[in-house]
Amino acid sequence: MQALRLGPTGHERVVLFAAGAGGDPERYRPLLDQLAAHDCQVIAPCFERFVAREATTAQLLARPAGLVEALHRWAAPEADVAVVGHSIGGWAGLCLAGATPWGRDGEPMDVPREPRVSRLALYAPAAGWFAGPGALDAVTATMLVYAGEMDTITPVEQIMQLKNAPAPVDLRVVPEAGHFSFMNTPPPGTVESDGFDRARFLADLAQATAEFVTAA
């Protein structure tokens, strides 16, 4: 397994980062550098790229399974873990925290769990998978959730359902933001709304995330 690892090692505060479908944490590097600068051990596994709409069940499950493997490999057993995830990475983080996604066959999926996860910072998470009965009932990790107003991949309406979880949820809708506005290096050809200042937003996002994962 390959992973981008930053900050102190063997630390009591671990940030486990889950990239979107592209699977490359380097595309979020300034964010991860900011988290490491706030005295967090950052573990960001690299994953095979896939197209989310075409992903197989095995490809999907490889994401939360890989996150658990990375924790077991590089984090201290007693570490307090926050998962920061974008898009399908947010889906994987929710799985670890106890959410149960419902598959394309209409049945609940058996996904990996990680009881050390106490916080989730989710950017445009793929929340549509958690619309089934009781899908969010076991999620008690505190959540900071961002949704892009202009996102057509993970629409605000889908993300709003995360408020059905029993956990505290701070959900913020970002005006003019799209699905890839949360990436420091978005896919080629990405076009932002005219009124959206991505550089400023990303700086604010990194600071807010750092404050969230390090809060007492």
PLM region spans:
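Hydrolases whose catalytic domains are alpha/beta-hydrolase-1, hotdog thioesterase
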Residues: 92-96, 104, 131
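Short beta-strand/loop motif that positions the catalytic acidic residue
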Residues: 139, 145-147
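Alpha/beta-hydrolase active-site loop
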Residues: 27, 55-78, 91, 95
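Short substrate-entry loop that stabilizes the transition state in hydrolases
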Residues: 11-12, 17-53, 152-155
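Short beta-strand-to-loop junctions in surface cap/lid or active-site-entrance loops
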Residues: 2-11
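Short alpha-helix in the alpha/beta-hydrolase fold that links the catalytic acid
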Residues: 141, 154-164
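Catalytic active-site module of serine/aspartate enzymes centered on a nucleophile-bearing elbow/loop
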Residues: 188-216
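Conserved alpha/beta-hydrolase "nucleophile elbow" surrounding the catalytic nucleophile
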Residues: 81, 85-90, 148
